[in-house]
Amino acid sequence: MSRFFAGGSESDSDSSSDSEPIQRQTAPQFTFSDEEEDVKRVVRSTKEKRYEDLSNIIKSIRNYKKIKDMSSLLSSFEDLTRAYAKALPVITKEENGVCPRFIIRALAELEDFINEVWDDREGRKNLSKNNSKSLGALRQKFRKYIKDFDSDLKKFRESPDAADDEDEEEEKKEEEESDDEEAAVVPAAKAVSFKKDTVEKVKVEKDDDDSDDSIDWGQDSDSDESSSEEEAYGANIRERFLKRPEKEDGDDGEKKKEKKKTKETKDSRKKKRVEDDDDEGWESSATSEKPKMFAKDAEIDVALVVNKLNEVMAARGKKRTDRKLQIEFLRELRAISEEKKLGAAVAAKIRFNIVSAIFDYNPKVSEPMKLEHWSKLLEEIQALIKLLLANEDIVLSENILDENEEYDTAPYKIRGCMLTAVERLDDEFTKLLKECDPHSNEYVDRLKDEVTVTNVIEQVVQYVERLGNEMETCRIYLRKIDHLYYKFDPNVLKKRKAQLPASSLTSVDEMERLCRFIYAKDQTDRLRTRAILSHIFHHALHDNWFQARDLVLMSHLQETIHHSDPPTQILYNRTMANLGLCAFRHGNIKDAHQCLVDLMMTGKPKELLAQGLVPQRQNERSLEQEKVEKQRQMPFHMHINLELLECVYLVSAMLLEIPYMAAHEFDARRRMISKTFYQQLRSSERQSLVGPPESMREHVVAAAKAMRHGDWQACSNFIVNKKMNVKVWDLFYEADRVREMLAKFIKEEALRTYLFTYSNVYASISVPYLAEMFDLPKSKVHSLISKMIINEELMASLDDPTETVVLHRSEPSRLQALSMQLADKVTNLVDSNERVFEMKQGNFFQRGGNQGYNRDRQNYRNQNQNRENWNNNRRQDRGNRNRNQNRDREQREQHRVEFEEKAE
């Protein structure tokens, strides 16, 4: 074979001549990497495999819980159920059917997570569609699956801090792995051979990069092998005769100790994290140095205590300040000042700083403070205000500078503001109430603190009145009004009924005194506006309708309220709602409807009264806006019953709308008095099958349908019954009086509706018959019909001798009215079709000369002519009607004269 086809090697090992046949060295078919030579094959049991699969799935579940990926969490839970089903034979065999503790822990954590996410309704709204759907499916599947683990979960809940099986397994694995690593690092000293393959293994252990050598093994490789063999020989002899076992045991002990230390540090870190979570994110300031108290032999006086106080308070607001430690220092400083008897001024200064430090303890202003801090805050403020009231020579004011403070001689001057502290206290109390569940005992317990808060405000009122600052007096008066205006005082009604002496003071008298002072002395519009609104609310709450109405009309608040801040607008809405209820109790149906129509027309009375947030679409309200609106919500005990408001509004609309609809049944230009009530009525009429009423709205709609036919008894039964009494009418103070007023108005409006509806049927109708039909006195029926005739609502005349109502046929009949409506609608349709046809023609640029202009002028002239004809016809109809009325009047006069002549 030629040298060209042979392709010999160019390396130094090719030293043969050209005549000799060239042998090409073949590469081995299978090469083993160094890793494959070193790694030992580990045989694991079925239990280890199954438990490892379960632990991996549990880790993924915990990761998905952190990021709230519900769809992935659902799929991982399904994987967990399948993996547990696979591991069940192993569990029954190895664990005697007892479920491992790490699985129970994972199920308990998953249950807590699902319940937490499900209870967070606001957070659920922000979930995506896929995540919310997956959350519902996960909750259903989990509740079904967890029934088999009820007993195990109960045992786990009793002692959740015990160690898991998974942790033990991991510890064993770590120990085994560490032992394997030690065995791999230190070669065994038992079987040391001097063969070539062992030498190659030692070489591989020394240098892993040498495994990538070329395939050509020649003389150089042999020489390398011989040299490495000699080195390995010496190394193996050294290792063979070296003492290892004792040292290795010592190393193992040291490593085990190190592992224990690392585990202890990890456990301590975990505990620290749990404590940090319990403290709700409080930072521990280990870096900041503790300010040292006084030396043992130091002479403690006022200046030294004040300097130390300033030193402690200098760290206020800084990043690494330990707030808890700061409060402890201040209390210790107070104890020292009391022990040394440094005076009331120093004690007041220290107590005021303690109050400020407690306020600073909560860094987030939007969140309420803890209950333990709240109780301490109440104690400190009560002690401070008692100290200020007992020592009249102490002046605590924000106008005093730090340089001008005086602690040695009276009058003592201290920089600070007691009013600001009490306002902050009141705000914190409101935040605590908002945070509690309103239907729990916790809310009742917190509400009991209002007595303490109002007592503190009353004491601060005395202190501020003693100082004589009018602006601060207005501010503290308004705080007192805020706790007083929404509370009902039964002594007001007792005093009105002369059941109490006239000299007794009631809440109305107190509100009058406080509000009059603010009206006269306040220099800001906001305080005066809030005082007027609270005054109106309190008057309306105690049925002082005329005083409340006059205040609203004189203040012109409805014109300027749009420029006020949101809390003032919320107070305005609450005031108008309560004013509407007061008007309804007094029987002023129109006024009640006008007060409530603005609230109810929007369909969002809950939001306008700050009594909760209505769920909206995702883009309508951002998270920041929702957070701000939550801060503006009113506490639950100040809420106005929304169902009561809606019922009063719908009943008022029914009493106004039904007679109006009957009077203008065929009027094409009829306007709606209440759009909301009209929609409720129309939606009920569109239903093919209407059952008995159940909700409050259905009761009002059924009553409206009965009133349209003049059936006042059915209408009254729908409005006033056992179910409606429980839901609505029993919530009023004098419920029986309200029910009597309702029955009277239903009878009167049903009579008006009956006359409007059936006036074209009767020629005359007897007044006693109407009085008997509607259970009204004859005088009331007579006055109602007279008003209708005077207001030109009913074309009729009263015949007093015969006590009859003579009805005139001046109105068109039903057929005539319908034909007139049809003619109007057909005319409008023709006009609109002509306009559409002209727009579609598009011949605007093909007219000759002034053709279009002439036609427009002709149309305008025709319209004017039609309008004049319509006016003439209307005048003629009015003249004919007047002539008919005069003729009827003359006939009645003639009949009366004839009747008198016959009687004589």
Swiss-Prot record:
The UniProt record lists the keyword Ribonucleoprotein: no
Start-end of Basic and acidic residues biased regions: 194-206, 237-247, 874-904
Low complexity composition-biased segments: 860-873
GO molecular function: RNA binding; translation initiation factor activity; translation initiation factor binding
UniProt xrefs under InterPro entries: EIF3C, EIF3C_N_dom, PCI_dom, WH_DNA-bd_sf
Comp. bias (Basic residues): 257-272
SUPFAM superfamilies associated with the record: Winged helix' DNA-binding domain (SSF46785)
Compositionally biased tracts (Acidic residues): 161-183, 207-232
Keywords carried by this UniProt record: Cytoplasm, Initiation factor, Protein biosynthesis
Bias type Polar residues, positions: 22-32
Chain segments carrying region Disordered: 1-38, 156-290, 847-904
Compartmental location: Cytoplasm
Function as written in the Swiss-Prot or TrEMBL entry: Component of the eukaryotic translation initiation factor 3 (eIF-3) complex, which is involved in protein synthesis of a specialized repertoire of mRNAs and, together with other initiation factors, stimulates binding of mRNA and methionyl-tRNAi to the 40S ribosome. The eIF-3 complex specifically targets and initiates translation of a subset of mRNAs involved in cell proliferation.
Quaternary structure annotation from Swiss-Prot or TrEMBL: Component of the eukaryotic translation initiation factor 3 (eIF-3) complex.
Family: Belongs to the eIF-3 subunit C family.
Protein name listed in UniProt: Eukaryotic translation initiation factor 3 subunit C
